[in-house]
A protein has these predicted regions:
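Acidic/polar, glycine-enriched structural segments that form the non-catalytic walls/loops
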Residues: 1-26, 31-327
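Alpha-helical support elements that line or immediately flank enzyme active sites
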Residues: 134, 297-305, 335-349, 361, ...
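Inter-helical turn/loop segments and adjacent helix faces that build the functional surface
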Residues: 142, 146, 239-246, 251, ...
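Alpha-helical scaffold segments in carbohydrate-active enzymes
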Residues: 299-306, 357-364, 443-455, 490, ...
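Helix-terminus loop motifs that line ligand-binding clefts
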Residues: 308-323, 349-422, 428, 435-439, ...
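Solvent-exposed loop and edge beta-strand segments that line ligand/cofactor-binding
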Residues: 323-333, 404-417, 473-485, 560-574, ...
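Active-site core of glycosidic bond-cleaving carbohydrate-active enzymes
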Residues: 331-361, 493, 497-500, 504, ...
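Acidic/histidine-rich catalytic neighborhood
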Residues: 401, 447, 451-508, 512-515
């Protein structure tokens, strides 16, 4: 296997700080770390997140992935001047093969003296709670007084929302410090332990104030002499409270002390070997063509790994992974449809774990269906750890009325129920895992099928599915959306097949499923091969979208039209019928797929 490539940041710019903090993020599925710089910048958003750790900040808020105290930040002062970048010679790259982020800078102070500042860090693939960082400083042409301040900075928030109370901070000996933090609802604890070791003759002291626990290291260097600081961080969290806080914190600290017996390079070697084995089974190699094709594939696979909580079936993959706070860290249908297939064909145990996440949250889905007057299971459009609905109530401002617009997805974008069932069937057909399909899979298929059977409404002599939103979220509250209806039928048909195959004794369900399949009305493919998106889409006017396709930014059409106006035009936000062709290719001819795509 050839070595996976790297991703380089071409130059330093304060305008792209957060872009590259996401693109070059690191992680292992247990925790995610944004690629923020050690030094502070006003526009920079730091972030570190644990899969499954959500909290609601207060009344009117929703559960979101908690931004943890920062451990990357370092204030570096050389001869009293604080290090900050502008246009220095620099190199920064993320190595996909090892997950290591490296940066090298030649920095000149205001009086012209030069210094090489190099940093590297990785999130361990071998020991999930471990982060290792190293920074070296070398004066090039003059002696220097260097001061490095780093530790645990608990002033971090989720865009101003604070989720953690500082429960306990403490220093142990000359190198160890620990902060224990508790979510404000008292349900979860986070222990962050740090070990900072510095080469050479240095002086050190600690401060703990204003939610910052810091170690300050000062060194006197001659030109050409290097000071190296290695920082190890161990992060544990819990929501069970089985052990006393001190006992639990001490156990976490002991794990860090064991890691500290090894050097940065030794720890990196173990993590890199874990990555090597992972890549060996999964890397896709492109022969010929543009070199960027290989980089794009390596990038995609790298992020697929670092966003997937393979260690914990009570967590799933957030829409933005663990790279930031977009979508509050919530789980959508994207997981089952776009991400699970990769794991299904590379490591089916991970796909099984992702499906068991939905199975664990089945009671919440059943309760949501019941509250809305339906049977079976209606999974939340956005979910976190509990399985409850987490979709915000409001979104953007209506440009016509000036009022906030309600998010309709949680009320009507129900196709995710069938999407989850589709993923169950994909897993079953690929693995033949009878123990899963007979238990968790059967429960998911039957409860999702029961939802669709109760969700349909009778119109004369047939059943229809009304008031839904398909994958295209610019077309809301329509009847007989093709994607939804076809997927619902597939859901019920496969649930019926599995029920019969495994001897389901629920005769009432079998009868109702048979009647649903017989009576459900499906939109038909037109003579030109096009499948209408819903009952009304083809009758809506079309407008010239060239202006909006060319515009920078996202959803710029909403600067000219309200959502209600867009809803009455032939405008798609996401693939809908084309997505259906992808999901159920055996039900459509190649000619029809091409007609819909055009």
């Amino acid at each position: 296997m050839t070595r996976p490539v790297t991703l380089s940041e071409p130059h330093f710019s304060q305008h792209t700080l957060n872009k590259y903090a996401s693109l070059m993020a690191q992680g292992n599925g247990y925790l995610g770390l944004r690629a923020s710089h050690e030094e502070d910048y006003t526009r920079q958003t730091r972030g570190m997140y644990l899969a499954g750790l959500y909290h609601r900040a207060g009344k009117g808020e929703i559960n979101e992935l908690v931004n943890l105290p920062d451990v990357v930040g370092m204030e570096i002062a050389i001869n009293g001047e604080v290090f900050s970048l502008s246009r220095e010679a620099w190199q920064r790259e993320l190595d996909f093969a090892s997950g290591e982020l490296r940066r090298s800078v030649v920095w000149r102070t205001s009086n012209g003296t030069g210094y090489t500042i190099a940093s590297r860090r990785f999130v361990s693939a071998d020991q999930l709670p471990l982060i290792a960082l190293e920074i070296t400083i070398t004066p090039l042409d003059a002696d220097a007084s260097v001061l490095i301040s780093t530790g645990i900075d608990a002033t971090q928030t989720n865009h101003g929302r604070q989720h953690l109370d500082e429960t306990q901070v403490r220093v142990f000996g000359q190198h160890l410090m620990q902060g224990i933090y508790t979510t404000q609802d008292g349900r979860s604890d986070v222990a962050i332990s740090c070990c900072c070791q510095v080469s050479g003759d240095v002086q050190q002291c600690y401060t703990a104030k204003e939610r910052r626990l810091l170690q300050h290291t000062s060194a006197q260097l001659h030109a050409g002499e290097t000071v190296t600081l290695q920082k190890l961080v161990w992060i544990d969290w819990r929501d069970d409270r089985q052990a006393a806080l001190d006992e639990w914190g001490s156990a976490s600290l002991r794990q860090l002390e064991m890691c500290a017996q090894q050097s940065y390079d030794q720890l990196l070697a173990a993590s890199t070997e874990n990555w090597r084995q992972w890549w060996q089974k999964r890397r896709i190699t492109v022969n010929g063509g543009d070199a960027h094709d290989q980089q794009a594939l390596d990038y995609a696979l790298y992020h697929l790994r670092i966003m997937t909580p393979a260690h914990d079936e009570r967590s799933s993959i957030a829409a933005k992974g663990l790279t930031g706070e977009g979508y509050k860290g919530h789980v959508f249908w994207d997981t089952e449809v776009f991400l699970l297939p990769f794991h299904l064909f590379s490591d089916p145990t991970v796909a099984r774990s992702l499906l068991r996440y939905r199975w664990h949250n089945l009671p919440g889905a059943q309760e949501k269906a019941r509250r809305n007057g339906w049977q079976g299971a209606l999974f939340p459009w956005e979910s976190a750890r509990s399985g409850e609905e987490e979709t915000p109530e409001f979104a953007a401002i209506n440009i016509r009325t000036g009022l906030r617009q309600k998010v309709a997805s949680a009320q009507a974008e129900h196709h995710l129920v069938a999407d989850i069932a589709w993923a169950v069937i994909q897993y079953w057909q690929t693995t033949g895992d009878e123990s899963f399909i007979a238990h968790e899979g059967m429960a998911l298929l039957l409860e999702t099928a029961k939802f669709w059977i109760s969700r349909a409404v009778r119109v004369n002599d047939r059943l229809e599915i009304h008031d839904v939103i398909g994958p295209d979220e610019y077309t809301e509250h329509v009847n007989n959306n093709a994607y939804t209806s076809y997927m619902a039928r597939y859901n019920v048909q496969l649930a019926l097949n599995i029920a019969r195959q495994f001897g389901c004794s629920d005769d009432a369900f079998i009868h109702r499923a048979e009647m649903f399949l017989k009576e459900l009305w499906m939109s038909e493919i037109q003579p030109d091969g096009v499948l209408p998106q819903d009952d009304s889409f083809m009758a809506k006017p079309a407008i010239n979208l060239a202006k909006y396709k060319a515009a920078a930014g996202k959803q710029t059409i909403l600067l000219d039209y309200s959502r209600a106006e867009v809803n009455e035009m032939q405008i798609l936000k996401q693939a809908d019928v084309v997505m259906l062709n992808y999901m159920l290719p055996e039900q459509f001819s190649a000619a029809s797929c091409l007609a819909n795509l055009r």
